């Protein structure tokens, strides 16, 4: 069958070292985009939490892991790169509000990543620099989470 032939070809190129097989059913070129891979390992998922907050200058602690939000919680090591996923309820995907898409990469805005972090940590989190965050955008996103505790924690953290 064509599927069997394709599998044999893929296995041949993996053994030869021309392509990588980081996870079952996922094949990449040797030089792959780590952000794109993060969004492909578990689907649907989007980059968020510490990864986005670090890139946005909201937290300063160095962590090389790519952190994402998905339908399950897992940590995966691929070629020494850690990919960490935190589970969030599907209804909190908010129809993509605060999630940007570029090619095959889905990434939360800093405001969305902030709210995801506060929501998942029940407010037990620390932020080094809140200036990059747009409080108006946060206020618009908060009601979509349907969480009074998120609202309270956010108001306390942002002093609003």
Segment roles from a protein language model:
Residues 18, 57, 119, 123:
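Hydrophobic/aromatic-lined pockets within catalytic cores
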Residues 33, 89, 118:
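A broadly conserved detector of short glycine/acidic/proline-rich loop/turn motifs that flank catalytic sites
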Residues 1-46:
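Short beta-edge/loop segments at beta->alpha junctions of small alpha/beta modules
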Residues 96-160:
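Hydrophobic alpha-helical interaction segments
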């Amino acid at each position: 069958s064509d599927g069997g032939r394709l599998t044999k070809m893929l296995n041949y190129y993996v053994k030869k070292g021309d392509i990588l097989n980081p996870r079952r059913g996922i094949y990449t070129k040797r030089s792959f985009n780590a952000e794109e891979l993060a969004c492909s390992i578990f689907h649907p998922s989007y980059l968020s939490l510490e990864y986005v907050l670090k890139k946005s200058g909201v937290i300063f602690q160095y962590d090389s892991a790519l952190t994402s939000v998905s339908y399950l919680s897992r940590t995966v090591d691929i070629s020494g790169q850690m990919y960490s996923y935190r589970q969030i309820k599907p209804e909190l995907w908010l129809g993509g509000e605060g999630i940007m898409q570029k090619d095959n990469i889905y990434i939360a805005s800093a405001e969305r990543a902030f709210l995801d972090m506060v929501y998942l940590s029940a407010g037990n989190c620390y932020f080094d620099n809140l200036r990059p965050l747009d409080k108006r955008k946060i206020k618009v996103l908060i009601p979509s989470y349907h969480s009074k505790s998120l609202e309270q924690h956010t108001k306390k953290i942002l002093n609003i």
